[in-house]
UniProtKB/Swiss-Prot annotation:
Residues 6-149 form the Nudix hydrolase domain. One of its GO terms (molecular function) is mRNA 5'-diphosphatase activity. Keywords: Hydrolase. This is RNA pyrophosphohydrolase. Its EC number is 3.6.1.-. The keyword Hydrolase applies. A motif (Nudix box) lies at residues 38-59. Its cofactor is a divalent metal cation. Belongs to the Nudix hydrolase family. RppH subfamily. One of its GO terms (cellular component) is cytoplasm.
Amino acid sequence: MIDGDGFRPNVGIVICNSHGQVFWAKRYGQHSWQFPQGGIDDGETPEQAMYRELYEEVGLTKNDVRILASSRHWLRYKLPKRLVRWDSKPVCIGQKQKWFLLRLECDESKVNMQRDRSPEFDGWRWVSYWYPVRQVVSFKRDVYRRALKEFAAIAMPFKERKFKRKGKKG
């Protein structure tokens, strides 16, 4: 399902632990890392899609997490032209994402990335809250920054909330 502007509806998932760290997943067979995310199926709400993707990609269920927040708006990113499939109809030029902030409520040993026949990820780790903004593939950075900024007051201890841009004082 692609909207009239060429964006595929999608959910993004930020899972945090009690230390203010976030779940950072390694893409299967690649050297790139990202937050879990996935498309919204026809007839599915963003929350339903989030729980489905959470189970498919990470092996966690609704009982393993608690929703702390969801983004107020859809956050969009465009794909680099080299990744757009121009021969598909309709053409998808990017993703529009509803983001969810979840807190892990179970033991992390429940994480299982091998539930699906074609797993999205083959590794994961806890990282500092702002780490993903600098490490994710460049075309997703602004969306990650915006989502994490919106969730910072909920996810992080007060002293660590401010995102410092590299090379700037303050």
